[in-house]
Amino acid sequence: MSVLDLNALNALPKVERILALAETNAKLEKLSAEERVAWALENLPGEYALSSSFGIQAAVSLHLVNQLRPDIPVILTDTGYLFPETYQFIDELTDKLKLNLKVYRAQESAAWQEARYGKLWEQGVEGIEKYNEINKVEPMNRALKELNTQTWFAGLRREQSGSRATLPVLAIQRGVFKVLPIIDWDNRTVYQYLQKHGLKYHPLWDQGYLSVGDTHTTRKWEPGMAEEETRFFGLKRECGLHEG
């Protein structure tokens, strides 16, 4: 596979750009997660960054990418409403894996947002989307810009939700290359990787949580629920970071 030039790809007509990415993805689908990361580091432009919500399976991508690219910036968008267990998990993994953690937050504090807008997460889809734009999307865009990121790694998996079921290994999003090394992993593969490397799930996994975000928009899984129903009251699956 030849080295990909972001500017050259963006200059192509849309159909040609889609075909070029599809050809590369067909080859990447045959590689292991480790091989995908290695390929990206060799063939895609730096600077590189890895985003993480420090959710249930976060240790997998953090370990995988950091092993091949030590000191890669790890971007966390902190809303101020994460579970106490999440903040503890962040500290634990940062220390254990020696992560180069970069924390980005909204330009308005959580208290100031509530004073101005009320509890946005209780205001339906429109309120949730505004909340996500302020607390997730804008801080992430700022992080990518300030870190001069051209290649962005993330730990999404197709099995997690319908909205992720058709995502490719490689895409262009927010003006940068986006690489999803474990996109085709199932829950068993995640478990096996964690066991092999002495890593843990998020502490709330043992309490029945399949997905963990903010305290006010995360629910425990109950029989009959799809995983996406445990977030944002079932109104949305994505927080905005991986859309668009």
Swiss-Prot record:
Where does this protein reside within or beyond the cell? Cytoplasm
Query: Would you tell me the protein name for this molecule?
Result: Phosphoadenosine 5'-phosphosulfate reductase
Per the record's keyword annotation, is Lipid biosynthesis included, yes or no? Answer: no
* Protein purpose: Catalyzes the formation of sulfite from phosphoadenosine 5'-phosphosulfate (PAPS) using thioredoxin as an electron donor.
Recorded catalytic reaction(s): these are:
[thioredoxin]-disulfide + sulfite + adenosine 3',5'-bisphosphate + 2 H(+) = [thioredoxin]-dithiol + 3'-phosphoadenylyl sulfate
**What broad class describes the main subcellular location of this protein?**
cytoplasm
**Keyword Cytoplasm in annotation:** yes
Gene that this polypeptide is encoded by: cysH
